Amino acid sequence: MSTFQHVIQTEADLRAILGYAGGPATNKVISEIDDICRAYIESSPFVLLGTSDATGRMDVSPKGDPPGFVQVMDSHTLLIPDRPGNRRGDTLTNLLQNPHIGLLFLVPGRKETLRVNGTAQIVRDEAVRDRLSMQGKAPVFVIAVTVQEAYFHCTKCMVRSHLWTDEHKNDALVSLGVAIIQHAQLDISREEADAYLAEDEQTGLY
């Protein structure tokens, strides 16, 4: 592990360099999902979920589906379907220990992002699960988020990254199959791993 010589350890030291936010940067935070936020969420096919366990160990998990897959139940409640995955349950087990959650919504082609913070429960109500069905299959679990904060994040990171262009497209990276073989120390070929993942993409979505 690297040893650094100049490490910020107090907020006073941080603020002496960073300064303080003011105006719109602080006033933009609202405590509910208004019509503007609702429209963005209903247009979003992708959201990142940040959670932590009781010790503070963090995890960020991506969720994706057709636009509007996260439903606005009311101005203070969001419903997120938990589709089939690898059964690790990182987000779910974290929420059982610590209900706090942070969401980051993206809409392809848009430079702004929407941040939502709150608390969450794992629910199994049949009516709730049914309203989030895809291809005739209801999610096993639904993450119900009680919204405490909602605000739009500025566009600078998207402008810097050129995320929605092909400028940084990289086909030279190894396949996911190769990465899993190496990291999980599997005794299978790249072709077998890639074939399994390709089939899972077709048959295991819902």
Describe the function of each predicted region.
Residues 1-206:
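Binding-site signature for planar aromatic cofactors or substrates
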